[in-house]
């Protein structure tokens, strides 16, 4: 039990998420401990319960935040490539697809950086952790947030889409 809790806390810290609200974190872990022992999945549940903190960290109040979204086709390809094992899940995307997606990420990230903005990618909840895994070797500090981690009063504007063909 100890190592599951510690892994989830480490996962949160690795992505720059505050773990000050230990009560919420431990309550969420207790709520879901019976259904899964996968620390990546548990981390996603905890992130969703910390949506207020995540929203205030990345999305200033009374301001529209420019974000990058994922083409639904890319989300489908990522989910289709997920393989579950005893040790957890991993992606089996072929190198060509991975390269095409990374090129698109690079283009969109550069576009936002050139506008003086922090690149933030918004994904559907089920894809978030896999997209983060896919990109972390190339874009270590890329912020990836799921729709379920964003408060309803946050104003977002999509200024780019990560697609496989990169020319969208």
Stretches found by the model and what they are:
Residues 6, 11-12:
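Long, non-coiled-coil amphipathic alpha-helical linker/lever segments
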Residues 2-4:
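Short, small-residue-biased leader/transition segments that mark boundaries at the very start
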